Amino acid sequence: MVETAARFIEAREFLLRHRDDYDTAYRDFRWPQLDRFNWALDYFDVMARGNERPALWLASDGGSEVKLSFAALSERSNRVANHLRALGVKRGDRILLMLGNVAPLWECMLAAMKLGAVVIPATTLLNRNDLVDRFARGRTRHVIAGADAAAKFAELPGDYTRIAVGGEAPGWHRYDEAYAAAADFAPDGATHASDPLLLYFTSGTTAKPKLVLHSHQSYPVGHLSTMYWIGLKPGDVHFNVSSPGWAKHAWSCFFAPWNASACVFMLNQPRFDARGLLDAIVRAGVTTFCAPPTVWRMLVQQDLAAWKTNLRELVGAGEPLNPEVIARVKAAWGITIRDGYGQTETSAQVGNPPGQPVKSGAMGRPLPGFRVVLLDAAGAEQEEGEICLRLDPRPVGLMQGYQGDDGTLLPLAGSAYRTGDVAMRDRDGYLTYVGRADDVFKSSDYRISPFELESVLIEHAAVAEAAVVPSPDPIRLAVPKAFIALAPGHEPKRDTALAIFRHLRTGLAPFKRVRRIEFAELPKTISGKIRRVELRRREAAARGEDRRGETEFCEEDFPELGAG
């Protein structure tokens, strides 16, 4: 495996060397060609040998901390792997891993990789129906969960291993018994780079989750592109605001930082507290920070300049960031939040890497290792179209495929992988997010991008979140309607609606303007994505019945706005 690992290291060093030179990195980077490769054994353990630098730093609002070195995590994961093997975990077995941000989460990920087992990451928010689905379609053989979550599994049928973390549960093995296992680990055979490693249940906004299968190279090696986008360096302290169970956690709390030999920092808060988070960034000396738009929007409500940080790189992920938020952070800290784009199915494929010009509203250019094209429904390249990845050559940072309900792998077909997202490309190759392919709609024959309208909406102080959908209209076919979650201190009343409509008139061309707004709680998936499909259905039904919401306002309600 030494030669294979050397190829991975060579690719890593190339990207670290050219972290500020996008043109060279994109032109000359080649994915390492791997046959047999186990990232935990062939890279992490080798890098961790005698390495007492911090690898994992877990903090809480209460002041408690856990800090583990690379060497300690390597040894602890060896012990866990030996313990799991003794409990019957075999190569290819599926392990449902449902833990919060506690050290055993990272130990189990490494241990499962060493064993050749397949991890099904799961959020602690799952209910019984979610678990039944993961047992049935995921073919779960073993469960590692917090002792306080054991009751969720009480009525689930099947013969599966139960391991409880953080306490005792009747009928469950105690996780802490693993620390008494042998400190040396010997694999039972070679791991092929194409062997399965992770099975994600995606949080679809329209249907039941798809099953995304990743291999021992598609995420561990593929996230070299994520490392490059973030701008990570050896010795960095990287903080990514994310919950376990979602792909972004593996992206930026596991593979990308450890590919760069950086320390993963996490803050556990019972309830989100912006000031507490900012205090932790200062206290831990965080150098690179990634957060979803929702968190950034809450952070900019603070006087950010009052926190003197060691931050060098700021990135946003999950959904594109609105220009207003980027501008506020730049004014406070002198650092530009750089957007990026990827999916559960891929590593980071588009982004603004360090040292490159950032265009307002653009999510960046294709990252090294990805050939990104915009295609129409017929497969022709366009300046605006669906974001697609060319498969010749196939990028390493792309899933093996979707697993069918019967357990078979549904491989990708054709010459390109279609993401389902739409973007526009400018003359310099920068891509600007338009929306999900099924979210974009027409009004009076004009194409409307919900994201563009939502970006203008949240610039208003009263708007915490917004989702724009088509509202059936007898004249224009459809007009943009915004469902708005109000910021604290604002009431769902006429004056608020009038202020928002006035703001929209200054920020949008007449054909793009939101004509109807409704103050409401936004429906979301378990991962926090807005379920626009539900809002579209709700709006279509309301218009079909000529029904209007109690907190809904239309432009025509306000004669003081004038014509337009």
Sequence positions of predicted segments:
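Conserved AMP-binding A3 loop
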Residues: 66-71, 197-221
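Conserved pre-ATP/AMP-binding loop-to-beta segment of ANL
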Residues: 52-54, 170, 180-201, 207-208, ...
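Conserved AMP-binding/adenylation subdomain of ANL enzymes
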Residues: 220-237, 244-287, 302-303
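ANL superfamily adenylate-forming
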Residues: 62-63, 148-193
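AMP-binding/adenylate-forming catalytic core of the ANL superfamily
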Residues: 126-127, 143-146, 289, 415, ...
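Conserved ANL (AMP-binding/adenylate-forming) active-site segment centered on the GW(Y/F)…HTG consensus within
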Residues: 334, 393-420, 437, 450, ...
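Conserved ATP/PPi-binding loop(s) of AMP-dependent carboxylate-activating enzymes
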Residues: 366, 378-410, 448, 542-544
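Gly/Ser/Thr-rich phosphate-binding loop
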Residues: 259, 286-291, 300-359, 371, ...
